[in-house]
Amino acid sequence: MQLALAAKYIGASMATLGLGGAAIGIALVFVALINGTSRNPSLRATLFPQAILGFALAEACGLFCLMMSFLLLYAV
């Protein structure tokens, strides 16, 4: 019983490691946006929607990891 509970906690903590990857991905998206805008300010209107799309995809991956962590903790 306690081994299964420990395995559940370890699995949930391993699933949350993806949140760190999502945070790094979001940071890299906006670093690229700032870098591109500083090099060529006239491209801001083109770069911003692509940056928001990249942000949304990176955030979705992080939310999937968080959802899996909650599922491991409370549903299994």
Curated annotation (Swiss-Prot):
Function: Mitochondrial membrane ATP synthase (F(1)F(0) ATP synthase or Complex V) produces ATP from ADP in the presence of a proton gradient across the membrane which is generated by electron transport complexes of the respiratory chain. F-type ATPases consist of two structural domains, F(1) - containing the extramembraneous catalytic core and F(0) - containing the membrane proton channel, linked together by a central stalk and a peripheral stalk. During catalysis, ATP synthesis in the catalytic domain of F(1) is coupled via a rotary mechanism of the central stalk subunits to proton translocation.
Site description Reversibly protonated during proton transport, residues in chain: 59
Record-stated family: Belongs to the ATPase C chain family.
Pfam families: ATP-synt_C
CC annotations in GO: mitochondrial membrane; proton-transporting ATP synthase complex; proton-transporting two-sector ATPase complex, proton-transporting domain
Keyword annotations of the record: CF(0), Hydrogen ion transport, Ion transport, Lipid-binding, Membrane, Mitochondrion, Transmembrane, Transmembrane helix, Transport
Membrane topology summary: Multi-pass membrane protein
CDD domains recorded: ATP-synt_Fo_c_ATP5G3
A GO term, aspect molecular function: lipid binding
Any one GO biological process: proton motive force-driven ATP synthesis
Name this polypeptide is given: ATP synthase subunit 9, mitochondrial
Primary localisation category: mitochondrion
Subunit and partners: F-type ATPases have 2 components, CF(1) - the catalytic core - and CF(0) - the membrane proton channel. CF(1) has five subunits: alpha(3), beta(3), gamma(1), delta(1), epsilon(1). CF(0) has three main subunits: a, b and c.
Compartments reported by the entry: Mitochondrion membrane
Transmembrane feature ranges: 14-34, 52-72
Keyword Ion transport in record: yes
Gene this protein is translated from: ATP9
